[in-house]
Swiss-Prot record:
The keyword Cytoplasm applies. This is COP9 signalosome complex subunit 2. It comes from Drosophila melanogaster (Fruit fly). Expressed during embryonic stages 11-14 in the muscle attachment sites (apodemes); pharynx attachment to the roof of the mouth and in the epidermis of the head for the dorsal and ventral prothoracic pharyngeal muscle attachment. From stage 16 onwards expression is seen in all thoracic and abdominal apodemes. Residues 1-31 are annotated as: Disordered.
Length: 444
């Protein structure tokens, strides 16, 4: 967040539709206004002097809380945050919250607190954030501002998620769900946008916990909400988690679709998650053994040479060419870039198995008998790993043959292989005859 983002992304000089009581003919106090702007002029170059000057604004109020005191406190919160004076910042924030009942309009206070929350949320200090959100929620119990309560609770829930404190997160989720229910205890579909925010938070929790049963049910529910106009960032989160769920279940095409949708949503919202999701899209593309390059799409093409993506781009090329040496070289050279992501790391072994299988099939094709150590040398793995790979291929009928463990030889069943090809050709021929018959019947 830039220091130039004045007043937590909200300009103090804007009116915010401030309303003054009809039975009051008084204008805003000129002395207060002048003191406020004199203080504001100091904040960039002399922040400590600005704090003392803003305190004079509060002193001039003489206990009568109003617009200029509220604005002065906002500036004091911001300056203390920049100076890392967190204790003093909290004192000033609690002081500001006493103004929201009567000193400023509901609309003004909501916008201001929203912008303060967004600004403070950039902090990495988890304890500070928790204190900030909980203080806000305490103040809102009396204010009865449902929208601000909801936003603050979702931020607190996200904080608990980032800290992996799922017990506290579940309590927050329960409260959020209750706020979006009808009198019958069902989800109020009229609150679709808020429901999607809750689902997004809950879906992230179940994804990390690898609770696919609950994740699947919630994911399907989220896609059936039609009454919402969700922020693309929320839909990006939901589709990304859906992609992870499908990939773990081996549904690679569904995962590919979800990751692509997540990437587009993140791209639209300007989220840095778009590059991570593009990596997942590439991963799904390779696992589904697609010959189509994922970077051929209009949306993904601009990122093809992105430094963060380049390693995955090269990985796709070597994978599609069944170049196992190049594939392993890229993995070694870009280990920190590729393997740092836990989700990608989970599935790299599957990719290696796929590419080794393709190279293996091509390697053994001319032979009737082939030595396992020879295969191990070609695949650059140990003979024991070759045996494991061969067993899998034989069991799923990718390879027809048997392993002679004593002599360390793979014996291929060429008769069965020929028979399979003959059966496939016969099936193809029968299908052509059926098609020809259908065409003749139609013409007749």
């Amino acid at each position: 967040m830039s220091d130039n983002d004045d007043d937590f992304m909200c300009d103090d000089d804007e009116d915010y539709g401030l309303e003054y009581s009809e039975d009051s003919n008084s204008e805003p106090d000129v002395d207060l206004e002048n003191q406020y702007y004199n203080s504001k002029a100091l904040k960039e170059e002399e922040p400590k002097a600005a704090l003392a000057s803003f305190q004079k604004v509060l002193d001039l109020e003489n206990g009568e809380k109003g617009e200029w005191g509220f604005k002065a406190l906002k500036q004091m919160i911001k300056i203390n945050f920049r100076l890392c004076n967190y204790d003093e910042m909290m004192v000033r924030y609690k002081q500001l919250l006493t103004y929201i009942k009567s000193a400023v309009t509901r609309n003004h206070s909501e916008k201001s607190i929203n912008s303060i929350l967004d600004y403070i949320s950039t902090s990495k200090n988890m304890a500070l954030l928790q204190n900030f959100y909980e203080t806000t929620l305490d103040a809102l119990r009396d204010a009865k501002n449902d929208r601000l309560w909801f936003k603050t609770n979702t931020k607190l829930g996200k904080l608990y998620f980032d800290r992996s404190d799922f017990t506290k997160l579940q309590k927050i989720l329960k409260q959020l769900h209750q706020s979006c229910q009808t009198d019958d205890g069902e989800d109020d579909l009229k609150k679709g946008t808020q429901l999607l925010e809750i689902y997004a938070l809950e879906i992230q929790m179940y994804t990390v916990q690898k609770n696919n049963k609950k994740l699947k049910a919630l994911y399907e529910q989220s896609l059936h909400i039609k009454s919402a106009i969700p922020h693309p960032l929320i839909m990006g989160v939901i589709r990304e988690c859906g992609g992870k769920m499908h990939l773990r279940e081996g549904e690679f095409e569904k995962a590919h679709t979800d990751f692509f949708e997540a990437f587009k949503n993140y791209d639209e919202s300007g989220s840095p998650r778009r590059t991570t999701c593009l990596k997942y899209l590439v991963l799904a593309n390779m696992l589904m053994k697609s010959g189509i390059n994922p970077f051929d799409s209009q949306e993904a093409k601009p990122y093809k040479n992105d430094p963060e993506i380049l390693a995955m781009t090269n990985l796709v090329n070597s994978y599609q060419n069944n170049d196992i040496n190049e594939f392993e070289t890229i993995l070694r050279q870009h280990r920190s870039n590729i393997m740092a992501d836990q989700f990608i790391r989970e599935h790299i072994e599957d990719l290696l198995r796929n590419i080794r299988t393709q190279v293996l099939i091509k390697l053994i094709r001319p032979y009737k008998n082939i030595a396992i150590p020879f295969i191990a040398n070609a695949l650059n793995i140990e003979p024991a790993e070759v045996e494991s790979l061969l067993v899998s291929c034989i069991l799923d009928d990718t390879i027809k043959g048997r392993i002679d463990q004593v002599n360390q030889v793979l014996q291929l069943d060429k008769i069965n292989s020929s028979a399979s090809r003959y059966n496939a050709l016969e099936k193809w021929s029968n299908q052509i005859q059926s098609l020809q018959f259908a065409v003749v019947q139609k013409m007749a």
